From Swiss-Prot:
Role this protein plays: Removal of H(2)O(2), oxidation of toxic reductants, biosynthesis and degradation of lignin, suberization, auxin catabolism, response to environmental stresses such as wounding, pathogen attack and oxidative stress. These functions might be dependent on each isozyme/isoform in each plant tissue.
Reactions listed under catalytic activity: 2 a phenolic donor + H2O2 = 2 a phenolic radical donor + 2 H2O
Organism of this sequence: Betula pendula (European white birch)
Enzyme class, broadest EC rank: oxidoreductase
Name of this chain's protein: Peroxidase 4
Cofactor stoichiometry and binding remark: Binds 2 calcium ions per subunit. Binds 1 heme b (iron(II)-protoporphyrin IX) group per subunit.
Keywords per UniProt: Calcium, Heme, Hydrogen peroxide, Iron, Metal-binding, Oxidoreductase, Peroxidase, Secreted
Signal peptide start and end residues: none
Amino acid sequence: FYDTTCPK
């Protein structure tokens, strides 16, 4: 899962 709270 990719954390969308991070810019990258």
